[in-house]
Structure formats: structure tokens, C-alpha cells
Amino acid sequence: MSRYRGPRVKIVRRLGPLPGLTTKRRKLTEQNKLQDKKQKKSQYRIRLEEKQKLRFHYGLTERQLLRYIRIARKAKGSTGQTLLQLLEMRLDNTIFRLGMAATIRAARQLVNHGHIVLNERVVDIPSYRCKPNDKITIRDRDRSRILIEKNRTARSRLRIPGHLAMKQNTALITQVVDPKSIGLKVNELFIVEYYSRQA
């Protein structure tokens, strides 16, 4: 299954705010509120929607998400918490959380086009798993600097998470992310339950 490229507001309308997918918000009207109350959701649908939230927010394919579930299952500790840590420590998500891009999709494009330097090497793999003490900088090109500065100015009110430290154009990953501090309301246990028969 390929990555979703369709209308994003349609997804936000169905699943709620997804900051990694789009900056647009759902307009709350009285009719929307009534529709939300009317719908009775099955247990399967509740779990499916939680899984879809995660998939669309991080911009993953079904196969990629299943692979992360399998890795999380093998690790020690809570599968759901480990899954969120794996996804939060991806390079494209880290760029997004630093405010260098408006969405995770835009952050992925920055990485793919070689605008990001990780530990003094250009990295063009968005799924690269960042580790504590990794240093992220902007590539020493005018185009890269202008593009990222424009994004950071637009997102100047953004609060940088506790596991990241930012000084001018250099960011440092200080520790592994705490799953409670992710920028998305999601019930990871429902996602693990959804995949319990597949993975």
C-alpha cells in the first residue's frame, strides 16, 4: 500500500487534528458536533481509527507501520510505548518537532533533498533513527538556510520538546523521547490490539 497523497482535510475531519499531516484544522460547527455524537463506533472501528491516526500523522505506509510494530514487540518494555519512541526518534519527525518544517511530509522532503546534516554527514534517509547525542545542523548552502529559517520563523511559537535542545542552527538530541510528550493524542494500546492478530 502506497503513502497517502489524497485530500488531507478529509482525513483531519474524520480522525481529528493531525499536526504531522497538515496545518489545517477542522471547522467545528453545531452540525459536526451532532454528527459526532450520533455515530456509535464498533470496537474494531475505534482501534482502526487509532491506528490510522498514527499512520497519517507520521506519513507511513501500512507495511512500514507493521514493521515498527514487530520491532517494538521484540524490545523490552511496553510495546505501545516502544512503538511511539521508535516513531518519535525518526529523523523526519525530529526535524518537524524542531520547527524546521510545517509538517512531517515537508520535513521528509527536506531530508530527501539533502538540506540536513547529521553528525557532520549529509543524511537523506527520513526514517533514520536518531540517538541521544546526535547533532543536527542545516547544510552550509544558502538555499538550505533560507528555506529552514523561513519555516522556523513561521513556527516561532512552537515549544521544542524536552529531549531536544536548539541553539541557532544546531540541534542536539539530549535523550530518548518520553512517549507521553508526543504531539499527538493517541491510545497506543488500541494500536497494539489492532495488530495483535497480524504481526
From Swiss-Prot:
Pfam families: Ribosomal_S4, S4. One of its GO terms (biological process) is ribosomal small subunit biogenesis. Gene3D superfamilies: Ribosomal Protein S4 Delta 41, Chain A, domain 1 (1.10.1050.10), RNA-binding S4 domain (3.10.290.10). InterPro entries: Ribosomal_uS4, Ribosomal_uS4_bac-type, Ribosomal_uS4_CS, Ribosomal_uS4_N, S4_RNA-bd, S4_RNA-bd_sf. It is found in: Plastid, Chloroplast. Keywords: Chloroplast, Plastid, Ribonucleoprotein, Ribosomal protein, RNA-binding, rRNA-binding. GO terms for molecular function: rRNA binding; structural constituent of ribosome. One of its GO terms (cellular component) is small ribosomal subunit. Its main location: plastid. Residues 89-151 form the S4 RNA-binding domain. It comes from the Eukaryota. One of the primary rRNA binding proteins, it binds directly to 16S rRNA where it nucleates assembly of the body of the 30S subunit. With S5 and S12 plays an important role in translational accuracy. Part of the 30S ribosomal subunit. Contacts protein S5. The interaction surface between S4 and S5 is involved in control of translational fidelity. HAMAP family: Ribosomal_uS4_B. Belongs to the universal ribosomal protein uS4 family. This is Small ribosomal subunit protein uS4c. The lineage of its organism: Eukaryota, Viridiplantae, Streptophyta, Zygnematophyceae, Zygnematophycidae. The gene is rps4.
